[in-house]
Amino acid sequence: MMQHTSVWYRRSVSPFVLVASVAVFLTATANLTFFDKISQTYPIADNLGFVLTIAVVLFGAMLLITTLLSSYRYVLKPVLILLLIMGAVTSYFTDTYGTVYDTTMLQNALQTDQAETKDLLNAAFIMRIIGLGVLPSLLVAFVKVDYPTWGKGLMRRLGLIVASLALILLPVVAFSSHYASFFRVHKPLRSYVNPIMPIYSVGKLASIEYKKASAPKDTIYHAKDAVQATKPDMRKPRLVVFVVGETARADHVSFNGYERDTFPQLAKIDGVTNFSNVTSCGTSTAYSVPCMFSYLGADEYDVDTAKYQENVLDTLDRLGVSILWRDNNSDSKGVMDKLPKAQFADYKSATNNAICNTNPYNECRDVGMLVGLDDFVAANNGKDMLIMLHQMGNHGPAYFKRYDEKFAKFTPVCEGNELAKCEHQSLINAYDNALLATDDFIAQSIQWLQTHSNAYDVSMLYVSDHGESLGENGVYLHGMPNAFAPKEQRSVPAFFWTDKQTGITPMATDTVLTHDAITPTLLKLFDVTADKVKDRTAFIR
């Protein structure tokens, strides 16, 4: 019996059988969400034949990719193991949160810090990686491969490539009308294919980064003509706080008709204007934040070249406005890169943030960014000042960590990161409690500004960088490509407040606005004009 087991264990397999086996495994285990989306779009009862051909085409594509990537004997096993691990990791986040892997999502992943990564890890993730990644990889690693001679190997490899192409092309030809509609109307469904989509996006991102590295690094100016009509020596200096929000969605704002009072403190402050129809530039922090300060607008904006483009903060700094960015999130996403480092401060640790020990998770709170702002004002006495406060806000999936106990108004709450396993209302409760903390932070920001209203014309602008999915259609978090992102990820709250003495008039609450309105708003607040955005709608008149 022992001898029989030993012989079985060392039984050799053809490299082509091994490649085909991995392709079958990845097709079946890494694409559950893809097939679920397919069955929703094409009900199996009416489209069984077509749905089966999609499975065949996907297997053909998987077989082609694995064959091409592992064509050399010394890379065969490493490549197959890498594909198995990649399939396990990417499919977990796709199946759990609805994540798709375009270049923007990959950039987000690369910029995720240790705390954010920890929020995403759990027992289910580890079990998925072991079951669908590690164990199959061990089988690949230890199986004996019987490599043919070079000539036979080449012919068989070519045969496998031809077979792969046949598996792809024949069903497409046989169901040409179906596939014409599939590729034209339902193009976003392809984004759920793992690990093919991540592989494609990695290649695309590498190409983008190479072009960026070889491109000229000179700043492209968009507002050389910018002029400030009045200076602080001609009027009261202006003090503006811009709260860059995180992951807040407009339909959970009480001002917009939400049944819960999620912004009770703002509702008590005179002069707050809520904007109910604002669309974000993108669905991720890495994409949206640079866009919020860009001159290009969402239609022209390119996240890959944004750091080499003049933004509105560069302009205001050049004109003499004192700029400060405090960050309790990740960083400024390149917005502050061209300004002196002293104008940026990291408030995600107790080094700068004085309010980090009010919760069991030792998370630094957004309100800590308000501590010590009086010192900045004193150091820039009599000057125009713009202060950016970049929130942690409602960053998921651990919404329950984003607020102190005093904001736990809605209970019970989801206290885990496997959101689909939480009772849905408990997930909503945790998210809404985090909004209460944001309400408090904005209110305190306004109250701080009011203490300086005698010496300065004071104003506050709040806009969230993007929204959030909370389980609608099985999608969680954010980061979907704009082409098919749900409205929950792009419809964001925005508020404006100004002291009555400033004479500034906000736009109507139902004005249709986007992140494109931020740059002209910041310019107007400091009496600056620039031709590039002179016709762009702002949050103020």
UniProtKB/Swiss-Prot annotation:
Q: How is it modified after translation?
A: Phosphorylated at Thr-285; may represent an intermediate in the catalytic mechanism.
Q: Which residues lie on this side of the membrane: Periplasmic?
A: 36-47, 95-122, 179-541
Describe how its activity is regulated. EDTA may inhibit activity. May be inhibited by ethanolamine.
Please give the Gene Ontology molecular function terms for this protein: phosphotransferase activity, phosphate group as acceptor
Instruction: Reply yes or no: does the keyword Protein transport apply.
Output: no
Bilayer topology term: Multi-pass membrane protein
Q: Which residues lie on this side of the membrane: Cytoplasmic?
A: 1-14, 69-73, 144-157
Q: Name one GO cellular component term.
A: plasma membrane
Name listed for the protein in its UniProt record = Phosphatidylethanolamine transferase Mcr-1
Q: Which organism is it from?
A: Escherichia coli
